[in-house]
Amino acid sequence: MESLESVDASSGSVGSYMSKSVRKHWWSRKGYHPTGSSKNGSRLKISSDENFQDELVVLDDAFLCNVPLELPSTSNAQKTAAESFSKLSPQDQLLSLQLNNVQESVFQQSTFNLPDALLDPGPASKEKQAVLSIGRPSWLPPKSKEEEKKHMREFEQIKKSAMRYDRQKQKEKIKMVEQKNKRNLYLVNVWEREILRNWPDALKSSRYAGIWRQGIPSRVRGRVWEKAIGNNLKLDYQSFFNARANAQKREAAEKAEQMNNANQFREDVCALELDLQSTMPHYSLFHTEGPLRRDLIGLLRAYSYYRFDTSYIPGTSFIGALLLLNMNLTSAFNCLANLLDKPFLQAVYTQDTSSLKSFYQTFLDTLKKNEPELATHLLIKLELVPDDFVYPLLRKLFIPMVSPEIASRILDCYVFEEDSFFIQLLMAVFKLLKPKLLVDDSRLVLSALLFENWDLGPEDEFMHFVYDISLS
């Protein structure tokens, strides 16, 4: 390939189409000036250590960009050339085309890979452009003036209608936010001034029956949960610190052992670490460097050593994290211990399947009544049992699969209604996930139930759906 240093001004592969003035302008823009002509006056000399390929020269203000004239068929190469060419000024584009003797179409990229019926096959003539209609392909007959005016009026009406619709939707959204804030303020006043001051007598009034179903405001949620859970274990402020101190002592003792107890301890620690990695990953509060990470670990270890009859069971971290989002560490420990001491959750977290049989049977009877097709598919066709697809949900308290808002609403209702609420909740979830559960692969069914995030919609709508389900 020849270099521009040896190209003849009047002949040669480039000289045949590049004038001397164009070449001078090209070199002058780069700071090079001809030192003179050769003996025959036909050559333009430059510094001997500056040689450039003359395949395809694209100029800009900073440097020479050489792109091969024979562009590869790959779209990436064409895209690179087109992008380089598009950055040039109009004068530089013209100069680049003159230097390379190529057509501008080389740099033009097609917008669509496939032909489009609405794209013109070629540029319209000046005569056709004079009569073309707006928004109409050039190869079709133009509209009449009356029709074009009519369509323009209709277009303006459609545009105005769309703008009115957008404004209306924005007003509705603002109104919904205002109503939600107003309702939240009302509920805060009711809980603080009426219910908490007159606990528990106020809840017996028909005026406040089922008020927790509307959602407990986050401002008072922690205090309400504490009162609703109760304190049958008679724990106080020092209970957490005593449990944590005992945990540290027992941890040190078990580290020194070399037999079964030490192995069990290592298994518990491993299970705890695995659980922490999947606890509310959307909240940075519980990440490795999160501000609540240490509190959560301390809470779980203190509780696991507080209950000598059980080791750490996967799932405890989810409810522990939810409690820490709404109350301080000592209150969270007291609530966790008292909550998991209730008969139903105690059976869940100690894996006492015999105590869960009545709950399983009630749920299966309700499922067969409300969703017979789904019940037949899960129990007969896939041969699943409640321990496969119900127990893991109860152990996790549904928290990993739902949004934090819905998880809080679930605990709002459970602390007042206990295990009967879980029947309605399970039915609502199975109804909403029914299309994903009617597949023939049990692995996909279990994945949809136990490992995927559920799209249940806004929390208010979902909770209304839960309570609309009839259990009778």
From Swiss-Prot:
It comes from the Eukaryota. SMART domains: TBC (SM00164). InterPro entries: Rab-GAP-TBC_dom (IPR000195), Rab-GAP_TBC_sf (IPR035969), Rab_GAP_TBC_domain (IPR050302). GO terms for molecular function: GTPase activator activity. PROSITE patterns: TBC_RABGAP (PS50086). One of its GO terms (biological process) is vesicle-mediated transport. GO terms for cellular component: Golgi apparatus. Residues 215-418 form the Rab-GAP TBC domain. This is TBC domain-containing protein C23D3.03c. It comes from Schizosaccharomyces pombe (strain 972 / ATCC 24843) (Fission yeast).
